[in-house]
A protein has these predicted regions:
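Conserved catalytic cores of ATP-dependent inositol ring kinases
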Residues: 141-146, 156-158
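Catalytic and substrate-binding regions of extracellular carbohydrate-active enzymes
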Residues: 1-143, 150
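Beta-strand-rich recognition/accessory modules
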Residues: 78-80, 155-161
């Protein structure tokens, strides 16, 4: 459960190291969506997706499996005020633009997670951005340009915790 049910295993955001909750009390929704030939757009709102595990069924499953729903494992109080992810697809070009709107209830540390399966990612710290390049064995390439209004720290790791 620390991987497939945990936000750490997905290309998403951690808030002070905390992951999205499990259960119906944590949820996201899609307020806008458009699909066209030249451009497609959607925005997902995950503002209510973070917090402690409180659903009785998941508390019981955690107990039975030995899963610890603790801050050290990524589950704690919600410090998130807003998380909206905008995704734009430019026709059939293979180009996607992802823009995250993030706001904390207080000053928080944001962790933007990117995962790769086959080959390690490469990271470049440039003056106004961080550029992350991922490749696969079939010559596929993905490039992420990360921009932030605050100072950033980067790390490439091969573990979830």
């Amino acid at each position: 459960m620390y991987s497939y049910r945990n936000t750490r295993a997905h290309n998403s955001i951690l808030v002070n190291g905390m992951t999205q909750t499990i259960g119906t009390e944590g949820y996201g929704w899609i307020p806008r969506w458009y699909e066209g030939e030249k451009i497609s757009y959607m925005v997902g709102d995950a503002s209510n997706a973070y917090g402690k595990i409180t659903a009785p069924i998941w508390l019981k499953r955690g107990e039975l499996s030995g899963t610890q729903y603790t801050p050290e494992k990524g589950w704690d109080e919600n410090k998130l005020k807003m998380f909206r992810r905008h995704i734009i697809q430019l026709g059939n070009t293979g180009v996607y633009v992802i823009y995250d709107e993030l706001e904390g209830k207080e000053a928080v540390t944001w962790s933007y997670l990117l995962h790769t399966v086959e080959l390690p990612m490469e990271m470049q710290e440039l003056p106004d951005e961080v550029k992350v390049t991922g490749k696969n064995k079939d010559e596929g390439i993905s490039v992420a340009h990360l921009f932030s209004s605050a100072k950033t720290e980067q790390a490439i790791v091969d573990t979830f915790f």
